[in-house]
Amino acid sequence: MTKVLFITANPNSAEGSFGMAVGEAFIEAYKNEHPQDEVVTIDLFNTTVPAIDADVFAAWGKFAAGEGFEALTEVQQQKVAAMNTNLETFMNADRYVFVTPMWNFSYPPVVKAYLDNVAIAGKTFKYTENGPVGLLEGKKALHIQATGGVYSEGAYAAVDFGRNHLKTVLGFVGVNDTEYIAVEGMNANPEKAQEIKEAAIANARELAKRF
């Protein structure tokens, strides 16, 4: 059975977000097309996603020195345990669907924190004499991103840092089979916002058949 992580990073629901509306349409279509698969929703705004901070570095230092989990402070244990849960869930999945808005040329900070939780040496990638090698080969990902302007092509494509960073990190851990759906231009062309949304939903439903 294929396991799909539906990873969202938006404080708004589908009623208040173009991207979430497209994401929900995709995942519902996917469930209809693949009823045997397991879909797990991860709302990053309602999930414990520790940032790499002094506590995490201190915990990693203790592990490197040969100390065990019991040597960590209570706060360090809580953060490491949450990070390990996020990592194990990510490693055990076969498909990833990220739904994010663009905020100031990137995605919400919690997405970066989540990627820091799951891009871990020895777990999702390893270092070799020929360079780093991803360990999650054979998996697939989709990124659905909503932007007020147009960033998928043209002069502003170079500053679509969220899309580029996510694709880079996924490739680094071995997930090179990626798809992208742009839900874009709603603020630049407000009179076409509904049309843009409906076109993206149609695209998402079609992609769900072969994802």
Curated annotation (Swiss-Prot):
<keyword id="KW-0285">Flavoprotein</keyword>
<dbReference type="GO" id="GO:0016655">
    <property type="term" value="F:oxidoreductase activity, acting on NAD(P)H, quinone or similar compound as acceptor"/>
</dbReference>
<dbReference type="GO" id="GO:0016652">
    <property type="term" value="F:oxidoreductase activity, acting on NAD(P)H as acceptor"/>
</dbReference>
<dbReference type="InterPro" id="IPR023048">
    <property type="entry name" value="NADH:quinone_OxRdtase_FMN_depd"/>
</dbReference>
<dbReference type="GO" id="GO:0009055">
    <property type="term" value="F:electron transfer activity"/>
</dbReference>
<dbReference type="InterPro" id="IPR050104">
    <property type="entry name" value="FMN-dep_NADH:Q_OxRdtase_AzoR1"/>
</dbReference>
<comment type="function">
    <text>Also exhibits azoreductase activity. Catalyzes the reductive cleavage of the azo bond in aromatic azo compounds to the corresponding amines.</text>
</comment>
<comment type="similarity">
    <text>Belongs to the azoreductase type 1 family.</text>
</comment>
<dbReference type="InterPro" id="IPR029039">
    <property type="entry name" value="Flavoprotein-like_sf"/>
</dbReference>
<keyword id="KW-0520">NAD</keyword>
<keyword id="KW-0560">Oxidoreductase</keyword>
<dbReference type="InterPro" id="IPR003680">
    <property type="entry name" value="Flavodoxin_fold"/>
</dbReference>
<comment type="function">
    <text>Quinone reductase that provides resistance to thiol-specific stress caused by electrophilic quinones.</text>
</comment>
<protein>
    <recommendedName>
        <fullName>FMN-dependent NADH:quinone oxidoreductase 2</fullName>
        <ecNumber>1.6.5.-</ecNumber>
        <ecNumber>1.7.1.17</ecNumber>
    </recommendedName>
</protein>
<comment type="subunit">
    <text>Homodimer.</text>
</comment>
<keyword id="KW-0288">FMN</keyword>
<dbReference type="GO" id="GO:0010181">
    <property type="term" value="F:FMN binding"/>
</dbReference>
<dbReference type="Pfam" id="PF02525">
    <property type="entry name" value="Flavodoxin_2"/>
</dbReference>
<feature type="binding site">
    <location>
        <begin position="102"/>
        <end position="105"/>
    </location>
    <ligand>
        <name>FMN</name>
    </ligand>
</feature>
